[in-house]
Amino acid sequence: MKKTLRFAAVVSSLAASAALLVAAPAAAQALGSQGAQLADEVVAVVNNDVITGRELDQRVGLIARRLQQQNAPVPPADQLRAQVLNQMVLERIQVQKAKDDGIRIDDATVQATLQRLAQANGMTLDQYRGRLEAQGVPWSIFTNDARTELMLSKLREREVDGKITVSDAEVANYIASQRGPNASQQQDLRFQHIFIKAPTNAPQADIEAAQKKADALLQQAKSGADFERLAKNNSEANDAKKGGDLGFKSPSALPADVVDAASKLRPGQVNPTLIRVPDGFEIVRLVDRRQSQGASAAAPKIVQTHVRHILLRVGEGKSEGQARQQLVDIRNQVEAGGDFAKFARTYSQDGSASQGGDLGWISPGETVPEFERAMNNLQDGQISQPIRTEYGYHLIQVLNRREAEGSVQQQMDIARQAIGQRKAEQAYADWLRELRDSSYVQYKIGGVGPAN
């Protein structure tokens, strides 16, 4: 599970790089001439290595472009450069550590990762490379970024994630704490929320920009602005179109910080502070409370997805390109009013074809990772682009979602994953701080120093 999650993070980071590399030069130029003056100078010494002004300029351009795409304010040039340089120093230290420890990423592994990234975008590798190069992204730079991401992921797995253990006692205590001593008296909670993305492993500049954006939205919400409209226009969660309405949920299905906030709120009130969650910042408004239906209502919940698909297998006279294009054509026809179930019965090549491709209610972990990631990114009723898995190409449509109390094993798995993720994030932060403290770093430009 850990390796699957780390790979997803690698793919996500590379996808962001692909989108941003296109406009890096223009964004860097927009920050003024300061960077150009430093292009050939050393801006930081990191152990036996250096970071040049040219490298810094390129990264600043990427971050500035990302902020612009998110409609987030771009910090002043000096502040942004300092934040980005600190992030580059941390990255360089980790790369050095990985190389010293003998971590190598061979070409085959890089190619396999790029292949999966291309498939996630519904393309062959050649098509994906062609699109990037047509947009001005040198393939060699993108490939090198992929190698670095994989190297750092492997280093973290070895130094941190692989050492995290979660005991059965911790799992039992977690489940018991979620139920609480008075589970039969607990209340279900109905929230609206606004979610602003800012993963804990994102560049510090991104996190600070996301927090600034979230703070501004929080002030509007506290001042009486229409929360539903704020959520629809700004939230980055899948339920944004619903005004951020989460519906009624048991306390066990919500982050602990959200439940804690609810204890201090009356219906209609907005929590006065941002809530930090692993993937970003939450602004929450308590809509209502209701009595839970007994102790079982407080048990850890899972989100099940009602989904259907069309599968086309590759081989036996059907190439990758043919399978993908056929699904693109089917998708276009369904979007124009065609019957998904009818197409599934006619063309799908798995056992669900006779049911119109209906797979029923799917719980987390019951499908292959590529299918599950695509499914989780879809809104109700939305249809995916062709998705490649080991079985072939899929066209996926989400019909509905629901909360359900998982089996005992599923509840234990949820608890183990939550505990492990919390432990890993804290351990990684501690390890990275120790690694930074044991390294020699000298900044060569004014106004820059170690991040707090």
Curated annotation (Swiss-Prot):
Signal is among the record's keywords: yes
Keyword Lipid biosynthesis found: no
UniProt cross-references to PROSITE patterns, sorted A to Z: PPIC_PPIASE_2
Gene3D superfamilies assigned to the protein according to its UniProt record, in alphabetical order: 3.10.50.40, Porin chaperone SurA, peptide-binding domain
Enzyme class: isomerase
Gene Ontology BP annotations: Gram-negative-bacterium-type cell outer membrane assembly; protein folding; protein stabilization
Listed GO CC annotations: outer membrane-bounded periplasmic space
Protein name, entry field: Chaperone SurA
Gene for this chain: surA
